[in-house]
Protein backbone atom coordinates (compact mmCIF):
# COMPACT_ATOMS: atom_id res chain seq x y z
CA UNK A 1 0.00 0.00 0.00
CA UNK A 2 1.28 3.49 -0.87
CA UNK A 3 1.45 6.14 1.82
CA UNK A 4 1.36 9.66 0.46
CA UNK A 5 1.82 12.84 2.44
CA UNK A 6 -1.13 15.19 1.90
CA UNK A 7 -0.67 18.24 4.15
CA UNK A 8 2.14 19.86 6.10
CA UNK A 9 1.08 22.54 8.58
CA UNK A 10 3.10 25.76 8.41
CA UNK A 11 2.78 28.02 11.47
CA UNK A 12 2.38 31.72 10.65
CA UNK A 13 1.51 34.94 12.46
CA UNK A 14 -0.44 36.62 9.64
CA UNK A 15 -2.47 34.27 7.44
CA UNK A 16 -3.19 36.78 4.67
CA UNK A 17 0.46 37.86 4.44
CA UNK A 18 1.62 34.23 4.34
CA UNK A 19 -0.98 33.29 1.73
CA UNK A 20 0.11 36.20 -0.48
CA UNK A 21 3.78 35.20 -0.06
CA UNK A 22 3.20 31.58 -1.08
CA UNK A 23 1.07 32.64 -4.05
CA UNK A 24 3.92 34.96 -5.10
CA UNK A 25 6.31 31.98 -4.91
CA UNK A 26 3.96 30.13 -7.28
CA UNK A 27 1.82 27.98 -4.99
CA UNK A 28 -1.82 27.45 -5.96
CA UNK A 29 -4.40 28.48 -3.34
CA UNK A 30 -6.64 25.39 -3.32
CA UNK A 31 -8.85 26.31 -0.38
CA UNK A 32 -9.41 29.26 1.92
CA UNK A 33 -12.30 28.56 4.27
CA UNK A 34 -13.32 29.77 7.68
CA UNK A 35 -14.68 26.54 9.10
CA UNK A 36 -15.89 28.24 12.27
CA UNK A 37 -14.81 31.00 14.64
CA UNK A 38 -11.18 30.27 15.47
CA UNK A 39 -10.50 27.94 12.52
CA UNK A 40 -9.46 29.21 9.10
CA UNK A 41 -8.08 26.58 6.71
CA UNK A 42 -5.85 27.75 3.82
CA UNK A 43 -4.41 24.99 1.63
CA UNK A 44 -1.69 25.87 -0.90
CA UNK A 45 0.05 23.48 -3.29
CA UNK A 46 3.47 23.97 -4.89
CA UNK A 47 3.51 23.62 -8.70
CA UNK A 48 3.50 19.95 -9.71
CA UNK A 49 3.21 18.65 -6.14
CA UNK A 50 0.77 16.10 -4.76
CA UNK A 51 1.47 17.40 -1.24
CA UNK A 52 0.20 20.74 0.05
CA UNK A 53 0.87 23.04 2.96
CA UNK A 54 -1.88 24.27 5.23
CA UNK A 55 -1.85 27.48 7.21
CA UNK A 56 -4.49 29.42 9.01
CA UNK A 57 -6.00 30.25 12.36
CA UNK A 58 -6.33 27.29 14.71
CA UNK A 59 -4.30 24.94 12.48
CA UNK A 60 -1.23 24.23 14.60
CA UNK A 61 0.24 25.02 18.00
CA UNK A 62 3.78 25.18 16.58
CA UNK A 63 5.65 28.45 16.93
CA UNK A 64 5.82 30.45 13.68
CA UNK A 65 9.28 30.25 12.16
CA UNK A 66 10.02 26.72 13.39
CA UNK A 67 8.95 24.66 10.36
CA UNK A 68 11.52 23.33 7.91
CA UNK A 69 10.43 21.74 4.63
CA UNK A 70 12.47 20.25 1.81
CA UNK A 71 11.11 19.72 -1.69
CA UNK A 72 12.61 18.41 -4.91
CA UNK A 73 12.96 20.56 -8.02
CA UNK A 74 14.32 19.66 -11.45
CA UNK A 75 16.85 22.52 -11.58
CA UNK A 76 18.14 24.41 -8.53
CA UNK A 77 19.39 27.40 -10.52
CA UNK A 78 16.06 27.76 -12.36
CA UNK A 79 14.19 27.53 -9.04
CA UNK A 80 16.46 30.21 -7.58
CA UNK A 81 15.79 32.49 -10.57
CA UNK A 82 12.04 31.96 -10.16
CA UNK A 83 12.26 32.98 -6.51
CA UNK A 84 14.39 36.04 -7.26
CA UNK A 85 12.07 37.06 -10.11
CA UNK A 86 9.16 36.90 -7.65
CA UNK A 87 11.04 39.18 -5.25
CA UNK A 88 11.89 36.42 -2.78
CA UNK A 89 15.33 36.41 -1.19
CA UNK A 90 17.10 33.10 -1.94
CA UNK A 91 20.52 31.67 -1.24
CA UNK A 92 23.14 30.97 -3.85
CA UNK A 93 23.04 27.39 -5.15
CA UNK A 94 24.74 25.09 -2.62
CA UNK A 95 26.44 22.33 -4.65
CA UNK A 96 26.80 18.99 -2.84
CA UNK A 97 27.69 15.50 -4.15
CA UNK A 98 24.10 14.34 -3.48
CA UNK A 99 22.41 17.32 -5.12
CA UNK A 100 22.18 21.08 -5.47
CA UNK A 101 20.24 23.14 -2.93
CA UNK A 102 18.62 26.57 -2.72
CA UNK A 103 17.29 27.94 0.58
CA UNK A 104 14.68 30.58 1.33
CA UNK A 105 12.35 31.56 4.13
CA UNK A 106 8.82 32.84 4.43
CA UNK A 107 7.95 36.10 6.23
CA UNK A 108 7.67 34.23 9.55
CA UNK A 109 11.06 32.54 9.23
CA UNK A 110 9.89 29.07 8.23
CA UNK A 111 12.73 27.61 6.16
CA UNK A 112 12.55 25.88 2.79
CA UNK A 113 15.20 23.77 1.06
CA UNK A 114 14.85 23.18 -2.67
CA UNK A 115 16.88 20.17 -3.77
CA UNK A 116 17.79 19.16 -7.31
CA UNK A 117 18.75 15.51 -6.83
CA UNK A 118 21.87 14.39 -8.66
CA UNK A 119 20.70 10.76 -8.70
CA UNK A 120 18.87 8.32 -6.48
CA UNK A 121 20.14 4.84 -5.64
CA UNK A 122 17.94 2.16 -7.22
CA UNK A 123 16.39 4.56 -9.73
Feature-to-residue mapping (PLM):
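Short, solvent-exposed beta-strand edge segments and adjacent coil->beta transition regions
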Residues: 2-7, 64-68
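Short, charged/polar surface micro-motifs in flexible loops or helix N-caps
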Residues: 47-51, 60-62, 75-78
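Short amphipathic alpha-helices within nucleic acid-binding modules
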Residues: 21, 77-82
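Short hydrophobic/aromatic beta-strand micro-patches
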Residues: 9-11, 70-74
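Short, charged/polar, Gly/Pro-enriched secondary-structure boundary elements
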Residues: 49-53, 109-112
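Short, basic, helix/turn surface patches
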Residues: 56-64, 116-123
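Core segments of cupin and vicinal oxygen chelate
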Residues: 2-3, 9-51, 85
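Vicinal oxygen chelate
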Residues: 1, 7, 32-33, 40-43, ...
Amino acid sequence: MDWKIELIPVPVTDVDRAKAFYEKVGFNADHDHRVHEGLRFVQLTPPGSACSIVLGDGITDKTPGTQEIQVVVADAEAARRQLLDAGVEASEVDVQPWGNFVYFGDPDGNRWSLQAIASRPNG
